UniProtKB/Swiss-Prot annotation:
<dbReference type="GO" id="GO:1990904">
    <property type="term" value="C:ribonucleoprotein complex"/>
</dbReference>
<dbReference type="InterPro" id="IPR002150">
    <property type="entry name" value="Ribosomal_bL31"/>
</dbReference>
<dbReference type="GO" id="GO:0003735">
    <property type="term" value="F:structural constituent of ribosome"/>
</dbReference>
<dbReference type="Pfam" id="PF01197">
    <property type="entry name" value="Ribosomal_L31"/>
</dbReference>
<feature type="binding site">
    <location>
        <position position="41"/>
    </location>
    <ligand>
        <name>Zn(2+)</name>
    </ligand>
</feature>
<feature type="binding site">
    <location>
        <position position="16"/>
    </location>
    <ligand>
        <name>Zn(2+)</name>
    </ligand>
</feature>
<comment type="similarity">
    <text>Belongs to the bacterial ribosomal protein bL31 family. Type A subfamily.</text>
</comment>
<keyword id="KW-0687">Ribonucleoprotein</keyword>
<feature type="binding site">
    <location>
        <position position="38"/>
    </location>
    <ligand>
        <name>Zn(2+)</name>
    </ligand>
</feature>
<dbReference type="GO" id="GO:0005840">
    <property type="term" value="C:ribosome"/>
</dbReference>
<dbReference type="GO" id="GO:0046872">
    <property type="term" value="F:metal ion binding"/>
</dbReference>
<comment type="function">
    <text>Binds the 23S rRNA.</text>
</comment>
<keyword id="KW-0699">rRNA-binding</keyword>
<keyword id="KW-0862">Zinc</keyword>
<protein>
    <recommendedName>
        <fullName>Large ribosomal subunit protein bL31</fullName>
    </recommendedName>
</protein>
<keyword id="KW-0694">RNA-binding</keyword>
<dbReference type="InterPro" id="IPR027491">
    <property type="entry name" value="Ribosomal_bL31_A"/>
</dbReference>
Length: 71
């Protein structure tokens, strides 16, 4: 097996937008990583229904197709 062909696998501190932080291991190459959603705030794990909107896509969709009548 060839040596030194695999990326470095180091500890990374992950910070969610909700404020939750945890340490994991990754090949990302950074010491810190920011994410938008984690298991502490994801609707599937919390049981709360909410729309997870990235960059206003839901609002854009509603603006574009909200006035249409049902078929």
């Amino acid at each position: 097996m060839r040596q030194e062909i695999h990326p470095k696998y180091t500890e990374v501190t992950v910070t969610c937008s909700c404020g939750n932080t945890f340490v994991t291991r990754s090949t990302v190459g950074k010491k810190e990583m920011n994410i938008d959603i984690c298991s502490e705030c994801h609707p599937f794990y919390t049981g709360k229904q909410r729309i997870v909107d990235t960059a206003g896509r839901v609002d854009k969709f509603k603006k574009r197709f909200g006035g249409m009548k049902k078929i």
